[in-house]
Amino acid sequence: ALENNQNHEDQYHGNFGPLWVETYQPILEASKSFLNACKEYGLKKNNDFNGENQEGYGQYQVNIKNGQRFSASDAFLKPVLDRPNLELLTNTLVEKIITSNKKAVGVKIKNKKGTQIIGSTCEIVLCGGSINSPQLLMLSGIGPKKHLMDLKIPLVHDLPGVGKNLQDHLTVNISYKINQLKTFSELMK
């Protein structure tokens, strides 16, 4: 498991990984009032927005450990930064995945030193997020054949699902001015 979820261990969550996940604390009085209002109105409670269903009201899970934000960098990168076979390049753009016989063998990068190709004898981990990952795959010739042909990008591998199924995570934020209760903003002053 990648996550260390303090609230759930099920088919959607693990609790032995390095990435800390917990329900947001503390529950402010204003939040308690909101949760109670949702319940009284008859809305469905959701104890896990990252599980099977995303509808309803409830508290969010967050990446906070000991009161501090705990990022993917904290979980995965910082513990291995001193490895001799790891070099971290900042302010560097990956322009393309280099392939040979449909196997990723390196990346083409650009930074203030110029453009260069970095080879790999092991795996290449692509983590550019929901926008940049499919973009980089398509720039590398991996994606829907017709779309790549329209863009005049040489086809490496026809993979129709690349760039598809992007979904918004819909949420509704409601702001109210309240009296007699401390808000998070007031507590942070």
Where are these regions (language model features)?
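Glycine-rich loop(s) and the adjacent beta-strand/alpha-helix scaffold that form part
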Residues: 97-189
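Conserved redox-cofactor binding core of oxidoreductases
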Residues: 1-104, 108-110, 173-189
